[in-house]
Amino acid sequence: MDLETKVKKMGLGHGQGFGAPCLKCKEKCEGFELHFWRKICRNCKCGQEEHDVLLSNEEDRKVGKLFEDTKYTTLIAKLKSDGIPMYKRNVMILTNPVAAKKNISINTVTYEWAPPVQNQALARQYMQMLPKEKQPVAGSEGAQYRKKQLAKQLPAHDQDPSKCHELSPKEVKEMEQFVKKYKNEALGVGDVKLPREMDAQDPNRMCIPGGDRSTTAAVGAKENKLAENKRTQYSCYCCNLSMKEGDPAIYAERAGYDKLWHPACFVCSTCHELLVDMIYFWKNGKLYCGRHYCDSEKPRCAGCDELIFSNEYTQAENQNWHLKHFCCFDCDSILAGEIYVMVNDKPVCKPCYVKNHAVVCQGCHNAIDPEVQRVTYNNFSWHASTECFLCSCCSKCLIGQKFMPVEGMVFCSVECKKMMS
């Protein structure tokens, strides 16, 4: 397929999840409606992951595409219908007998994802070492956490040009080369193993503090005894605390098998969130999630959330923007050369600021222009003018004077305050 055809086929999937309720805004949101180039809802400005959208198939396609053309193809299967790679997510179902007064019932727990290991007891141990609120039990807070992290850590628009907004053929080519490079050099999936099993595979390895291992072979009975003792001294590469005997550890092939992590310590070095499904990116001795690895390699547009592959872009408010995406967060008007105000780290044009965000003057009850001086006390504001910042009793101008505040009123003296009480 040539680049022109690829560009024409691009679309952001605007029909997906349409009308789904927002789990954060509740009834304040009319239902999910994807913005035409931002990755947020047009109604409430929350992301798709904050809405009750069934995304399991879409997420499995996304991860499947990530693993395509890598050594992790054993984790994907291609659909016969369209050849799309699907992530073979390992689902774990545990059944626990629960004793009641008369009968024994079966309590079933389904994990929406579990480490792909043959030993289910090891997978169960791994899950128990995660914080309760991050265990991906179906229908739980942990499952919702995993869903959010899949969206946050592995954005589809970081690997698939068809999920991006109006890329040029040149940008498509550059993105494809970038994705190929990080698949070859950084992408990995953690392995859950017992440290002693790793030693059994290579008896010459001995563990020393910090998770690092030496390759000095033991010679003689005393040396063998010393080596055996040292093998129990495992420590986590992240927290440097010791690993308990019999507990599972996570290894990352890109990092080398001389390093290991507690399950709860296998986190992104930037956002410090659990690496979703143990999918990591390794760079300069650090673990990253997909998002923050890409951020370390390319600028990201604060408007559309996509990586920038163009040589021309703008920087404002310590953020990067596609030239066409430096827009008002409320009305999408271009802000180049215009006056704007930052509201919650988002640029807003002056008319939208006055209409939607400006504070109201307690004196004249009109919105206060962002370029006009004002007086603020607690949650109340006034125009800093002789017409507005006045004693609520005698109308004396209080600019530069002492005053007594009472809720939304101000007084020049105790006498004026008493007269209004």
Swiss-Prot record:
What are this entry's molecular-function GO terms?
A: zinc ion binding
**Is this entry keyworded Zinc?**
yes
Looking at the record's lineage, which domain of life comes first?
Eukaryota
GO cellular component, alphabetical, reads:
cytoplasm; focal adhesion
Where does it live in the cell?
Cytoplasm; Cell junction, Focal adhesion
Sorted keywords for this record are: Cell junction, Cytoplasm, LIM domain, Metal-binding, Repeat, Zinc
Q: Name one GO biological process term.
A: negative regulation of cell population proliferation
PET domain: residues covered: 92-199
**According to its UniProt record, which protein family does this protein belong to?**
Belongs to the prickle / espinas / testin family.
Q: What name is this protein filed under?
A: Testin
Q: Which organism is it from?
A: Equus caballus (Horse)
